[in-house]
């Protein structure tokens, strides 16, 4: 496929009929960084206890929250037997640093998106996340500052992702679908076409 964003429907059809496949010279649609990032945002909004999603997006786009800070948040979570999201709130309350402003902004956005989720559909939620997090701006800046043509297609992938949401009634149905796709991809035999 010349435009990588167009592979999604083809890939989903192959999975639906149980035909293993391999993408040559690229990644499967749901394995692309920008798609994984948006899915992680959606998973976290849907479930504040999703620590893997939290770790993926706490610093995406870059907020100056490094591995040391994430390690401290993780330690608070383990010591208090709470989610990393709740631990980040505790960390921000206990530490008066520049980073805690970024963490607080992140927390406030996640909580705001939970309200959006209650009042709007999953498509509007995704658009709100992309806009409020400045994720598309981040991709545009990456494309502008890079000579890698793949960076230009990332925004197309995001648009295709939003288009794919129309096939589902709600966020939970979509996330369940993606979970099954990823499970299927991980369990694929070595024989592929």
For each feature predicted by the language model, list its residue ranges.
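Conserved helicase C-terminal RecA-like lobe
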Residues: 4-19, 32, 39-193
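Conserved RecA-like helicase motor-core motifs
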Residues: 18-28
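A short beta-strand-to-loop transition that corresponds to the Sensor-1 phosphate-sensing loop
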Residues: 1-4, 25
């Amino acid at each position: 496929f010349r435009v990588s964003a167009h592979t999604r429907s083809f890939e989903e059809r192959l999975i639906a009929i149980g035909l293993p496949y391999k993408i040559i010279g690229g990644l499967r649609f749901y394995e692309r960084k920008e798609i994984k990032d948006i899915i992680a945002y959606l998973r976290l909004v849907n479930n504040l206890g999703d620590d893997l999603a939290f770790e993926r997006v706490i610093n995406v786009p870059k907020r100056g929250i490094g591995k040391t800070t994430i390690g401290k948040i993780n330690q608070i979570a383990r010591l208090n037997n709470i989610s990393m999201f709740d631990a980040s709130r505790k960390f921000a309350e206990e530490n008066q640093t520049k980073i805690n402003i970024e963490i607080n902004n992140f927390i406030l956005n996640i909580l705001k998106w939970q309200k959006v989720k209650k009042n709007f559909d999953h498509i509007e939620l995704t658009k709100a996340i992309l806009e409020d997090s400045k994720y598309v701006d981040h991709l545009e800046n990456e494309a502008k500052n890079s000579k890698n043509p793949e960076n230009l297609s990332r925004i197309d992938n995001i648009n295709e992702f939003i288009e794919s949401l129309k096939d589902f009634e709600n966020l939970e149905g979509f996330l369940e679908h993606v979970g099954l796709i990823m499970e299927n991809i991980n369990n694929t035999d070595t024989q592929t076409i």
